[in-house]
Amino acid sequence: MSWDDAGNDDAVLMDSWDAEVDFAGDEPILDSWDEEPKAKKEAAKPKPKPKAGGKKNAKGEEKKEQVLAIDELDPQTRKELMKKAELESDLNNAADLLGDLEMAEEHPRARAMQKEQELAAQAALLRPAMTKDTPIEDHPLFKAETKKEYQDLRKALATAIVTMHEKSSLNYSSSLAIDLIRDVSKPMSIENIRQTVATLNILIKDKEKAERQARLARVKGGTATGGAGKKKAKAKTNLGGAFKKDQDFDVDDINYDDFGADDFM
């Protein structure tokens, strides 16, 4: 083995070392062996969450503006808004304590409304259907106590009864309306009955006036008081006095003695 051969071996070793360095790529050279695990641990750490201080500050400013706006309202409106805000706050706190619930289905207020609807539906199903034998006084309208409730009852009865006139005007008048007025007037005092009669008299005058106006609309030349008006006299044809009685002549007044024999020639 010569020195030249030894030089060749050194060149081969240098080439292999350069190849190993190129194979490593462009990775940075670490100062120590434990730096690579540290870098991996730092990359695996979760990123810190942004602080919610900005949102809280924004909510605080919004709440402050709402409070200032409420202070400018009248006491009654302010009291109602504060009560509503307290109720919503209580409901939201209850929802937070129960966990992440669906607002449309699981919110306490939604559940309460749904329960009320279910109870109302059950009550409607359990309510018996009205028949001819069902007492009419069981209707809620007949539980009237105040003036307004009596007025509502009167309007409901009038609307329901008047429609019966369309079915049979004869039975409506003779078998329902007249006798009904008499029956409902029996418990009243004489003064109230007189007021009822006066009310009916006013109704009579109004009906007569309406019928008179309807008749005048059909009659040409009518008057406002209901008369048919003056009829125009028919014009007589003037024949120049040819047929006047004083100008008539009688055949018996003619004297035939003046005629002679020559008159017939």
UniProtKB/Swiss-Prot annotation:
The keyword Protein biosynthesis applies. One of its GO terms (molecular function) is translation initiation factor activity. One of its GO terms (biological process) is formation of cytoplasmic translation initiation complex. Signal peptide: none annotated. Residues 24-34 have a biased composition (Acidic residues). Keywords: Coiled coil, Cytoplasm, Initiation factor, Protein biosynthesis. Residues 78-106, 190-220 form a coiled coil. InterPro entries: eIF3-like_dom_sf, eIF3j. It comes from the Eukaryota. Residues 35-45 have a biased composition (Basic and acidic residues). It is found in: Cytoplasm. GO terms for cellular component: eukaryotic 43S preinitiation complex; eukaryotic 48S preinitiation complex; eukaryotic translation initiation factor 3 complex. Residues 46-57 have a biased composition (Basic residues). Residues 24-74 are annotated as: Disordered. HAMAP family: eIF3j. PANTHER family: EUKARYOTIC TRANSLATION INITIATION FACTOR 3 SUBUNIT J. Component of the eukaryotic translation initiation factor 3 (eIF-3) complex. Belongs to the eIF-3 subunit J family. Component of the eukaryotic translation initiation factor 3 (eIF-3) complex, which is involved in protein synthesis of a specialized repertoire of mRNAs and, together with other initiation factors, stimulates binding of mRNA and methionyl-tRNAi to the 40S ribosome. The eIF-3 complex specifically targets and initiates translation of a subset of mRNAs involved in cell proliferation. This is Eukaryotic translation initiation factor 3 subunit J. It comes from Candida glabrata (strain ATCC 2001 / BCRC 20586 / JCM 3761 / NBRC 0622 / NRRL Y-65 / CBS 138) (Yeast). The gene is HCR1.
